[in-house]
């Protein structure tokens, strides 16, 4: 019978070290990740993607955490230092940043497995019984204690968190596994072009979420073997998991948030369309991802900013926002904002109309602009009278990126402004 006693769970989380892999580029986000890693991507009006796995760790009772960084890491490191520096080492708590440092070779991190291997000495110093390896570039809420309990009680060497996804969505994007009735993994293929479907549903498959639990010494042994294999790509999905499923106990854990009915939310915001859509979903009256749940808060760096302000109330010049998230420091000055997410210190000037927009911090939209279904990168200044999102041929001609679903990306470079905002 499963043991879910508070003492059992608290012992598990205390004996666990979490390693968040946060070095990914996010190439399918194109210019949006030219100056930041995917885990440093802004989300939901005030957060960054990395805040979600970090908050899940803290809320689950896991207080020893390493954040592995590599690509364009400055903004990510700065955010973690500012927002997550409150842990007390004397109480056994820590959030450590682990940049690529050529610890065991002259190469930078060569893959997900190599990123962990090069930090073995740091993990060993923590003396954990279990190591939880987490993807740093997904938006979700999850109580990791449930997965830890399932791992311990199954006697597994490794546990892989998974969920059912459409075959078309998984193709080329996710690791796909086959499992026996007891959830033991019997087959695994990394990002196949033609994923194996579920026996009971030809339209869906079982996809890895990139979250793993290992027994510590077992993990170290497998990483050493992988490091000695000259043909390995140093990747958990491509190399480690396929090599161990036959001779070792690898189990799948079906993703569930552990936060109650209807709370199982997980999104890969790895494309411009999915990033835009995930932000738009937050605007419904009862969004599937509840950022207002005080029982499972999402922590982040809190800037000291004045409240949002809406000014002018004339018939043709009324500052207003409907069905929107408007963050601190924003000023809506005689403009109309509808179904949009505005991050900190955005200013929308008079007579402009904004709809379906995700606007990152420090953006200024000057007068008489009409913007629809756009993502505006940090620090942009939209010139007066500009119309974007209403004619995609014109948008492309001006150098903006238009997605297959009609979302328009605007960056400082596209506007001819100096680069470098993170």
From Swiss-Prot:
Belongs to the bacterial/plant glucose-1-phosphate adenylyltransferase family. Gene3D superfamilies: Hexapeptide repeat proteins, Spore Coat Polysaccharide Biosynthesis Protein SpsA, Chain A. This is Glucose-1-phosphate adenylyltransferase. Keywords: ATP-binding, Carbohydrate metabolism, Glycogen biosynthesis, Glycogen metabolism, Nucleotide-binding, Nucleotidyltransferase, Transferase. One of its GO terms (biological process) is glycogen biosynthetic process. One of its GO terms (molecular function) is ATP binding. Homotetramer. It comes from Shewanella amazonensis (strain ATCC BAA-1098 / SB2B). Pathway: Glycan biosynthesis; glycogen biosynthesis. PROSITE patterns: ADP_GLC_PYROPHOSPH_1, ADP_GLC_PYROPHOSPH_2, ADP_GLC_PYROPHOSPH_3. Involved in the biosynthesis of ADP-glucose, a building block required for the elongation reactions to produce glycogen. Catalyzes the reaction between ATP and alpha-D-glucose 1-phosphate (G1P) to produce pyrophosphate and ADP-Glc. It catalyses: alpha-D-glucose 1-phosphate + ATP + H(+) = ADP-alpha-D-glucose + diphosphate. It is an enzyme of class 2 (transferase). The gene is glgC. Alpha-D-glucose 1-phosphate binds at residues 109, 175, 190-191, 208. Its EC number is 2.7.7.27.
